[in-house]
Curated annotation (Swiss-Prot):
It is found in: Cytoplasm, Cytoskeleton; Cytoplasm; Cell membrane; Mitochondrion. The gene is TCHP. Keywords: Apoptosis, Cell membrane, Cilium biogenesis/degradation, Coiled coil, Cytoplasm, Cytoskeleton, Membrane, Mitochondrion, Tumor suppressor, Ubl conjugation. Tumor suppressor which has the ability to inhibit cell growth and be pro-apoptotic during cell stress. May act as a 'capping' or 'branching' protein for keratin filaments in the cell periphery. May regulate K8/K18 filament and desmosome organization mainly at the apical or peripheral regions of simple epithelial cells. Is a negative regulator of ciliogenesis. This is Trichoplein keratin filament-binding protein. Residues 168-191, 386-405, 415-498 are annotated as: Disordered. Residues 259-425 are annotated as: Trichohyalin/plectin homology domain.
């Protein structure tokens, strides 16, 4: 019996599905484990943070503050109860005191009633006496008013009083005119004195302002001169910085030339060594050494010339560098003379001797080159350090100069602004003083005009009153002359006096 067979792709699909299911289960387990771990770490972080917070000084202080607040509340409550108890005690004492006073008042009511009755009787009798006095005074006034002789005497006195009053009014008017004239003179004198004082103050203020303007102008000129000097100094510092940068570039160029010469020398040595031309090599090597020495001598000569042209700063270090450069120059010149002597000797050597001499001289040259390179490196390094220090000093000086110039410019701007504000204030002050003087003049003129008008009105009123009085007197005299004498009616029969 034949077994059924399954296609290959079906088996592969089933294995792939199983593998995907296992992978998903594994990812789910990993995700669940990751969530558990993250939850654990999150809870541990929360616990540790809370524990740290509870055990921190801030939590301790907060707890102590809460304890102190509760303690203060308890103390306040006890204090409030004590005050309430004290108030209750005071209220009881006050009630007892009021009860005693009420009892005493009730006992003294009868005595007070008797006193009031006695006082009422005294007041009544006093009123009766006062009424009697008033009645007597009224009777006396009535008799005095209705007595003909007294009336004639009063009329004569009134006429005399009127005549005397006219004289008195004339004298008072003259005195008022004199007083007004003196007051006007006093006002004029005060006005002139105030005007002179104001002019003197304005003159003194103008002189003070001119002096301040002069001093301020001198200060501004001095600041402008200082600003110009700072600008010249800044230009000089910029030029010096450019010169120092050129010197540094020159040193770098010289050092690069030495490196190139060294590389060229090494290549030439290799070629000469391969060709085994010892005599020619010795000659060329000698010439090369001479050229190197000559180049080093030129470099040192240039350094010495640069040092002579630079400013006299860092004197001790510069003298040491100059001395080292001079000594190096002298040593190079001596070695140059020695190499020339060696070159003359080489012309007389044989090949084997030249070979031995080559090896010997090569060792000597290597030692000398090493020492010379070391010395040149020290000299160049010192020179570069010196140039770098000068550049830094120049930069700091430029920064200080720039700050100083900016401060001077700000001072100039502030001075100009202050001068402008002061000028405006002076103009406003002058205008205010002028307006004040004009107002005073106008007020004086108005007062004088009002005084004149019042005097004219008073004179006109007096003239009108006098005319009216004369007209009334004349009319009354004419009426009395026409009517004749008429006795005045009285309420009781008048007794004819003999």
């Amino acid at each position: 019996m034949a077994l059924p067979t399954l296609p290959f792709y079906w088996c592969s699909q089933q294995r792939l599905n199983q593998q995907l299911a296992r992978q998903r289960e594994q990812e789910a387990r990993l995700r669940q484990q990751w969530e558990q771990n993250s939850r654990y770490f999150r809870m541990s972080d929360i616990c540790s943070s809370k524990q740290a917070e509870w055990s921190s000084k801030t939590s301790y202080q907060r707890s102590m503050h809460a304890y102190q607040r509760e303690k203060m509340k308890e103390e306040k409550r006890r204090s409030l109860e004590a005050r309430r108890e004290k108030l209750r005690q005071l209220m009881r004492e006050e009630q007892d005191l009021l009860a005693r006073e009420l009892e005493e008042l009730r006992l003294s009511m009868n005595l007070q009633e008797r006193r009031i009755r006695e006082q009422h009787r005294k007041l009544k009798s006093a009123r009766e006496e006062q009424r009697k006095l008033i009645a007597e005074q009224l009777l006396y006034e009535h008799w005095k008013k209705n007595n003909p002789k007294l009336r004639e005497m009063e009329l004569d006195l009134h006429q005399k009083h009127v005549i005397n009053s006219w004289e008195t009014q004339k004298e008072e008017k003259k005195q008022q005119e004199a007083t007004a004239e003196e007051e006007n003179k006093r006002y004029e004198n005060e006005y002139e004195r105030a005007q002179r004082e104001a002019l003197e103050r304005m003159k003194a203020e103008e002189e003070r302002r001119q002096l301040e303007d002069k001093l301020q102008a001198e200060a501004l000129l001095q600041q402008m001169e200082e600003l110009k000097l700072k600008e010249v100094e800044a230009t000089k510092l910029k030029k010096e910085q450019e010169n120092l940068l050129k010197q540094r570039w020159e040193l770098e160029r010289l050092e690069e030339e030495r490196k190139q010469m060294e590389a060229f020398r090494q290549k030439a040595e290799l070629g000469r060594f391969l060709r085994h031309q010892y005599n020619a090599q010795l000659n060329r090597r000698t010439q090369q050494i001479q050229e190197e020495l000559e180049a080093d001598r030129r470099i040192l000569q240039a350094l010495l010339e640069k040092e002579d042209e630079s400013q006299r700063l860092h004197l001790a270090r510069r003298e040491q560098v100059i001395a080292d450069a001079a000594w190096m120059k002298q040593a190079i010149e001596e070695q140059l003379q020695l190499e020339r002597a060696r070159e003359a000797e080489l012309q007389m050597l044989l090949r084997e001797e030249a070979k031995e001499m080559w090896e010997k001289r090569e060792a000597e040259w290597a030692r000398e080159r090493s020492a010379r390179d070391r010395l040149m490196s020290e000299v160049l390094t010192g020179r570069q350090q010196q140039i770098q220090e000068k550049i830094e000093q120049n930069r700091r000086a430029q920064e200080e100069s720039l700050k100083h110039r900016e401060q001077l410019i700000r001072n100039l701007e502030e001075a100009r602004e202050s001068a402008r504000r002061e000028k405006e204030e002076n103009e406003e002050l002058k205008s205010a003083r002028k307006q004040e003087l004009e107002a005073q003049v106008a007020e004086r003129q108005l007062q004088a005009w009002e005084a004149d008008q019042q005097e004219k009105e008073e004179e006109e009123e007096a003239r009108r009153v006098e005319q009216l009085s004369d007209a009334l007197l004349q009319q009354e005299a004419e009426t009395m002359a026409e009517q004749g004498y008429r006795p005045k009616p009285y309420g009781h029969p008048k007794i004819a006096w003999n």
